């Protein structure tokens, strides 16, 4: 089985449907006897350029290990789902389980807010 990293951009008005969509994608991966190494919800973020007259999107990251024939089904599912604005599926050499830099930066910002400056 191969390791893949998938980034999804989901329509920002449908963030409440995100858990249902992710569950559907998880069932597809598990149906192929694949494993999910990492799921990260990056939240709503500004797009670099507008896509379909949208300026924001809900970002989601998945690191999975599946047979190569599952990728075609995932790709078709993403392509025909109206709520998925963009997707990218990248083959990676090994599984990635640590927190991504995108989430680390969010945690760093939260840590900075909690700090108290004493002078």
From Swiss-Prot:
GO terms for cellular component: cytosolic small ribosomal subunit. SUPFAM superfamilies: Ribosomal protein S6. Keywords: Ribonucleoprotein, Ribosomal protein, RNA-binding, rRNA-binding. Pfam families: Ribosomal_S6. InterPro entries: Ribosomal_bS6, Ribosomal_bS6_CS, Ribosomal_bS6_sf, Ribosomal_S6_plastid/chlpt, Transl_elong_EF1B/ribsomal_bS6. GO terms for molecular function: small ribosomal subunit rRNA binding; structural constituent of ribosome. GO terms for biological process: translation. Belongs to the bacterial ribosomal protein bS6 family. Binds together with bS18 to 16S ribosomal RNA. This is Small ribosomal subunit protein bS6. The lineage of its organism: Bacteria, Pseudomonadati, Pseudomonadota, Gammaproteobacteria, Enterobacterales. The gene is rpsF.
